[in-house]
């Protein structure tokens, strides 16, 4: 995403990398401002890559904000960062060849096992893209996707992969979210479930939430077994583009990001308080 924001055509230069690292600090400042204005720090965490986000992680830990980093080329790339979570974005086909699945599940089991020993939990943002045959079998693409996600979680659990947090994009499969959440908690597992939102770069909303963000935030708040949101780069993409092009000042970008996060938090809390489920 940062290559897109900075319009980097090829391999990033050292100057490009420093610019990208600075933009990550802007996003963190937005989160920090939101926390200072009332979002409970115990309810938020920041997920960055270990390549450019070390300074952000250190500042987050100093504020007692939860931290997560992607493993990159292996577990060693995040061990030295002392993060609270190892974050993995994964598209998985539970019907793919057995040897392909076994290899991946073993890798995840290693991460999960390391987590048990080192008190670092996994965040798995999971998706599944159905094949034409799978769509045919289930009748439509959304029903196929929901069932593949459910089957994927079952396979991970059977393989001993213990994720502290599961995250899913609920668009199109809203009616299946309670089932996915129930599977994540099966047999008394203490996993938490998040719904992914703000992954749309096309809709330009600074302080206003777009329709998808409102819908998913309310869905998360009103669904038993769902604990919160995994907020994607759509919440700050346009602010960073405008900042990098000189259209807005740094402080304006930070405040806009903070307001966006505050609006989502307030909508979640208001919707949860009004829900008969809780």
Residue map of PLM features:
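Alpha-helical scaffolding segments of alpha/beta enzyme cores, especially the outer helices
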Residues: 26, 106-117, 151-155, 175, ...
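Active-site-adjacent beta->alpha loops and helix N-cap segments on the catalytic face
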Residues: 94-114, 172-185, 210-211, 243
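Alpha/beta catalytic barrel-like cores
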Residues: 1-96, 162, 205-228, 233-278
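Hydrophobic alpha-helical segments and helix pairs
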Residues: 74-123, 127
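Catalytic beta/alpha-barrel core
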Residues: 45-49, 68-72, 84-104, 144-176, ...
């Amino acid at each position: 995403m940062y290559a897109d924001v900075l319009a980097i055509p090829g391999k990033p230069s050292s100057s490009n990398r420093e610019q990208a690292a600075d933009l990550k600090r802007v996003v963190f400042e937005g989160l920090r401002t939101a926390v200072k204005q009332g979002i409970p720090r115990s309810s938020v965490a920041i997920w960055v890559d270990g390549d450019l986000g070390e300074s952000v992680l250190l500042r987050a830990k100093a504020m007692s904000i939860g931290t997560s980093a992607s493993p990159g080329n292996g577990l060693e790339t995040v061990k030295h960062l002392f993060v609270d979570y190892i974050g993995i974005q994964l598209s998985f086909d539970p019907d793919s060849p057995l040897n392909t699945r076994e290899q991946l599940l073993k890798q995840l089991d290693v991460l999960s096992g390391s987590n048990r020993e080192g008190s670092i939990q996994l965040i798995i943002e999971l998706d599944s893209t159905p094949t034409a045959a799978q769509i045919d079998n289930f009748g439509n693409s959304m029903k196929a996707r929901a069932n593949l996600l459910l089957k994927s979680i079952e396979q991970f659990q059977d393989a001993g992969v213990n994720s502290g947090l599961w995250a899913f994009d609920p668009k199109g499969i809203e009616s299946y979210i309670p089932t996915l959440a129930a599977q994540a908690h099966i047999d008394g597992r203490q996993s938490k479930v998040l719904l992914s939102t703000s992954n749309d770069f096309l809709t330009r909303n600074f302080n206003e939430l777009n329709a998808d963000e409102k819908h998913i935030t309310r869905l998360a708040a009103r669904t038993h077994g769902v604990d919160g949101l995994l907020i994607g780069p759509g919440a700050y993409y346009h602010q960073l583009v405008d900042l990098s092009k000189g259209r807005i000042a740094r402080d304006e970008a930070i405040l806009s990001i903070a307001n966006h996060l505050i609006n989502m938090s307030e909508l979640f809390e208001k919707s949860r308080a009004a829900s008969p489920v809780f």
